[in-house]
Amino acid sequence: MIKRIFALCLSLLAAGVSAQECIPLDSRSGHIRWEVRPSEGDALPAVPAIVPGCVFASYVAAGVEADPNFGDNAYRTDKSRYDRNFRYTGLFPTPPVGEGRTLWLRFEGVNRKGTVRLNGHQLGHLDGFMQPGDYDITRLVAPDGENRLEVEVEWVGYPVPNFRSPTYISSAGWDWMPYAPGLLSGITDDVYLSLSGDVRLVEPWVRTKVPDREHAKVELLTDVENRSDKACEGVLRGEIRPGGIAFSHPVRLEAGERRTIRLTEREVPGLAVEHPQLWWPNGMGDPALYTCCLAFETDGRQSDARTVTFGIREYGYEWHDGIFRLKINGEPVYVKGGNWGMSEWLLRCRGEEYDTRVALHRHMHFNMIRNWIGSTTDEEFYDACDRHGIMVWDDFWLNSHPNLPHDLGAFQQNAVEKIKRLRNHPSIAVWCGDNEGVPQAPLDDWLRGDVAHYDGGDRLYQSISNAQGLSGSGPWANFHPGWYFAAYPMPYGYKGRPAWGFRTEIGTAVFTTFESFRKFMPEESWWPRNDMWDKHFFGKSAANAAPDKYFETVAENYGEADGIEDFCRKAQLLNLEVNKAMYEGWQHHMWDDATGIMTWMSQPAYPSLVWQTYDYYLDPTGAYWGIRKACEPVHIQWSHADNSVKAVNTTREPLEATATARVYDLDGRLLPQFTQQLRVSLAANTARSLFDLNFSEGNLARNRPVKASSSSPDGAGAGALTDGNDSSRWASEYNDDQWIEVDLGERRAFTEVVLRWEDAHAAAYKLQLSDDGRTWRDVYETQDAQGGEQTIPLPLQQARYVRMLGLRRATQWGYSLYEMEVYRRDAKAPKLSPVHFIRLELTDRDGRLLSDNFYWRATRRGDYTALNTLAPAKLQVRSQLTAAGGRKVIRTTVRNVGRSVAFAVHVQPYRRSDGERILPYVADDNYFTLLQGESRQIDFEFDASLLPDDRYTVRAEAYNR
């Protein structure tokens, strides 16, 4: 990235030389007064303009439009008032220029086109939201007066994807954001003034290679341009920090000449760096950054200066059995990330707000963000990713529509500018041509060539976001947690090879907390569910999120909600469980064949009820906490599908550890028969199996041979019936007269058979037994089966074969069973409570905790309603405030002083001054469970400005409140 505002490079530059000075002309700078009005007509008045930003956001800020985030206001706006051209006018004084200096006016981007005039003089025409404009205005500014800057912005027009690209493809609405009136037309990127001499430094570029961890090679390229009509001689000086690598290089330029200067270790031996500080993704090491300060001097005077921040790193790319793998600095990277659709649907995320959002991604232990369809162009986003060790999968502005932009030339120019502007960022790992499609000819070849030439081939160009080594897109709806562990969690309609692989999109609806919900939903629309919810995409407008299924699952898992507050509370448990399982399911198969996963979506652009981790107000949902737990670099996890426990190490260091598993009943009593402990050596970048939690101990059918009358490709085959995996299933052909049988190996005695049905269950069936597999006797029959988990008690039986004989299907499909289990039950043996708890711990040699994990499990698949029978929890809360370095921390200790389990405790700090939540914050945990007498310390860290008077309160509330 190239720092522009008051960049200082002092150490080896000539004494007394000032760095390049830049004067920002954004609307918050105080250096200019902006206003905007329609180019023609009086449909709207002139209002103060937000620059950078879109036209519509300026009118919202001016109060002309009601808050478009609230209720259905976004849909009530008369978009015809904004779907037109607008004129921006800015008034600014002339800054001191100095003799022999040139004053430049720079535009970083206008959406979609813009004509620029200064004091009545046309400077140029901008075409595309990443095309820059660089204008010498030295002789055009008023010497001692005010200057009038005008920008005529042409709106985007219809249709948007992909015809109007380069632009914000989702601006006409998507299934996660409304139509943005004006289609985000406006001055959408930075505007500033700068000063230089006759010679300018243009597009400096730092490239790095890492042959091994102890050595790196740095290459510096920069264009040097002589803007004068005379030849000149000068010196290019620079210093790289840390390391103090200083250099100077003489340069002679003819009049008007522009030349590329290339410096390598041959010209500057120090560019062969010993013991470099490498840039690592989050969880693998520190994202070390260097600065390269450049200045060009003529006659002992600085003509221009630039500071480039870069990271020493080298990406690598491999395909194992056709599956994509990413490497950095020679090490494989297991990718854990999220899709970032837009920063904010009206472009109102700016400056330090990017750092806040990217820091939340780092705190979730993510190491990658996908910049979906290149919808974020602000350099502050990339700066934040560099600082926080978040790699970027960076798309260009094409969706899967089989059509080309109307103006291929403008697209190509903007694509080249994007690469050149952003290539110094170490965070960019992949350039991607098209979302879920291959760019239509000639763009695919053009983009591949652009990356090869302007990025030097240092990073991969990937044509399509969900194929060519990737495992598809989706699905985007919630499933039972075990589904993510079983072969294979594939998107609907996927025609490639089934795999976990590298999935660039998979997600689920994620409902907000109640306190966020009430900020954007009118009270009369709170409950019951209604069409207003669909204005925030909980309905048919976001069908891919399956909100109906999500709503039903909350009720099935936790019972019918009695109102919106109860629904939001229960929804957070679904958010946490499913999103944690999504990442843990992939990690369960790490390198076999899973190589990466990115949720759809990690960053909300609009107050939404689907696809997010934290919400629009930066309140972490249950999804955030589930993902944070799953993605920790050293992790212990349980499989919902087969009850196995694994340890996962995505760091670069091996470790010795002890793994412990304990199971507790609903009352918090330890069930010692399930306790297991194992010492383990865990290699770097691996997942290792530890042991199984055998909740089906005594199951005579486990892993026994199975035969069936038929098997449909809808299922995993007959063997799935006894594999102990609650998410693999047998499915029959679509006929009533179907059967499936288990061979127990010999004649066995038993008293109980358990059948776990998928939705396609039997309405009527028989249970039959046989000693020889030919002659069968009936021991159970039903004509009114309801599906789900059915436990069939029997008088003591003896047989070798057990058969389910279908008589009548309950659906149009065949019969489908997850499991058949066969037991001889001792009436006196203790039974698991309907809901019980699993606690896992991983500790180091000294007993220090490396990872812990907590699950709730039901004896009936997905039925957690027994949690509603827990006695109310009694919690004691103590807290203390400290401050340092512009941050404040509320250290909170929550203790369970009651007799019941305190399940899913949510803790939130509030300001006393206005009763509002203190957001955003970072903390270690939330929605945690405390057994009797246990306590948990949580540190809430946040910006000091969020609590200026130090007056706060902390609320802790368990699910069983």
State each model region's role.
Residues V202, V206, A216-E219, D304, ...:
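Active-site region of glycoside hydrolase catalytic domains
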Residues M130-D134, Y158-R164, P181, Y317-G472, ...:
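Active-site mouth of glycoside hydrolases
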Residues R33, L91, G109, D189-D190, ...:
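Extracellular/lumenal ectodomain signal focusing on beta-strand-rich modules
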Residues R28-S29, V36-L44, L183-G186, P489-L655, ...:
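Substrate-binding clefts and catalytic carboxylate motifs of secreted carbohydrate-active enzymes
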Residues T115, R148, N367-M368, G389-M391, ...:
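Beta-sheet entry/capping signal
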Residues A14-A15:
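N-terminal signal peptide c-region/cleavage motif recognized by signal peptidases
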Residues M1-L8, S18-M368, W372, M590-A594, ...:
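Secreted/periplasmic carbohydrate-active enzymes, especially glycoside hydrolases
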